[in-house]
Amino acid sequence: MGTVAGAPNSAGGGPGVAGANAVGGASTSAGSAGVTGLAGATGGSAAGGSSGSSGSSGSSSSGETTIVPDPSWTCGMADGIPAPSTGTLVFSVSLTVSATHNVGTTQFGKRRQLDVSGGTITGDKLKGTVLTGGLDYELTLSNGAMELEEVLVYKTSDNTSIFVRNCGVAAAGDQAIRIVPDIEAPTSGSYAWLNTTKLVGTRVATADKITLDIYDVSKAPASTNKTTLKDPAGVPNTSWDCVGGSGTKGDSVFTENVSLGSSFSVSNAKRGSRNIIPITGGTTTGKVAGKILDGGADYQLAGSSGTTLDARYTLAPSDGQFIIVRNCGPINSLVPAFEAAVDGPYKFLNDGKFLSSAPGSGSGGVSITFYERK
């Protein structure tokens, strides 16, 4: 988060993650210096909800069926996410959960965030660890269906860094969330297959652990047994991609002083090269006064169209609330997205009418100010 550039984070396709591990939607960004946050986890913009009203239709249990996701959160498989059991298990991940933050009911639904403090990866073709600082964003809709986004970094046994975003959905009542990994690995070498293989999996969470089992469904037979998910009508959808916006800066709202860890790279991956700068804490002053939690990062992407910043992290105001943040875009055109409880003092942040300064020098990292958008 100290310098810049600007490039899209997710290429091609509609909202969500693409079938061959290419997440779709607009471009997210990462740049040398930018703090960004999360607008949720779907494929559409954070505007109007889907037209459906029920959590699912079809089979009452979606464990062995193909799940057809709501158009707002397709995970790159709009025609249906196959049952993992129809494929071949390729690797498993055990994540350690260090904390769970209940954000409350936000503009999108009931949100909680699980902090990942590490983990292990086991499989014949992939072994290694999961770095601390991962984020698991779980959204429960008013109809009981669930949507998920996870942001993780794998470190293989031969010291290769791999960037992972998991997109997930579940019908009301399902304990396991069906996930589609969007993986950015070096395009040459022994992990290039992760960029293009059609992978799906399951995510099961307990109080202190998340288990991911990932399957290759490239040769899975087509299924006519389907469960169709529909988001509640009249509710905004979260966005898989960065939110855009234009305008001029008005009054300042609050300022962050963000502490940063040592950066590392995911080089020559399918979308370009990522410079990942861990967020290790910080403070906020102004209308949001408190601290920045340790976790998340600025996942900067340098690609063919330039460098973009994509910072994901969480604010903890001094009154005990939590605010999820995603600050995205080219360094001089950052647009933040916030997610706060609709019955709390920071619900005004959910309106999406804000702009961000470029990152400047700060104590131990960078300083960023957010402004009302005129």
Show the residue positions of the predicted features.
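Ser/Thr-rich, Pro/Gly/Ala-heavy low-complexity intrinsically disordered linkers and tails
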Residues: 1-66
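Beta-strand-enriched cores of mature, soluble protein domains
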Residues: 67-374
